[in-house]
């Protein structure tokens, strides 16, 4: 897991990515805990929101695992905080991968 700056050494190419953004950093940790317990996903990173108390979580795995993890994360987060956005990219394009690292640690 990467929180803040630095570059991940792990290669996530070919893995689906699930991204969710919440209004509370604490709720993000509760949600990512539920996600990682619900399915075989790796938490790629947690990025703090610049203007608020929230954060964005990126997790990687197979499409089915990322979907199950996302469902679990959102179910736990919904009563705790505002869910700004969430999405799953089943097969990120080669050029998309570097862009997902650009904001890490910013």
For the regions a language model picked out, list residue spans one by one.
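Short amphipathic alpha-helix segments
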Residues: 26-40
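Short glycine-/aliphatic-rich beta-strand segments at the starts of folded cytosolic domains
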Residues: 11-23
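Metallocofactor- and cofactor-centric catalytic cores in central/energy metabolism, strongly enriched
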Residues: 58, 86-95
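A common structural junction motif
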Residues: 39-42, 74-83
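Short, low-order "capping/linker" segments at domain edges
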Residues: 94-106
């Amino acid at each position: 897991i990467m929180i803040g700056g630095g570059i991940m050494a792990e290669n996530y190419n070919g893995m689906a990515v699930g991204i969710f953004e919440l209004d509370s950093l604490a709720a993000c940790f509760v949600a990512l805990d539920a996600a990682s317990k619900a399915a075989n996903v790796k938490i790629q990173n947690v990025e703090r929101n610049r203007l608020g108390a929230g954060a964005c979580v990126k997790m990687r795995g197979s499409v089915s695992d990322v979907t199950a993890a996302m469902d679990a994360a959102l179910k736990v987060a919904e009563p705790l905080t505002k869910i700004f956005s969430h999405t799953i990219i089943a097969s990120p394009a080669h050029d998309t991968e570097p862009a997902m690292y650009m904001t890490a640690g910013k």
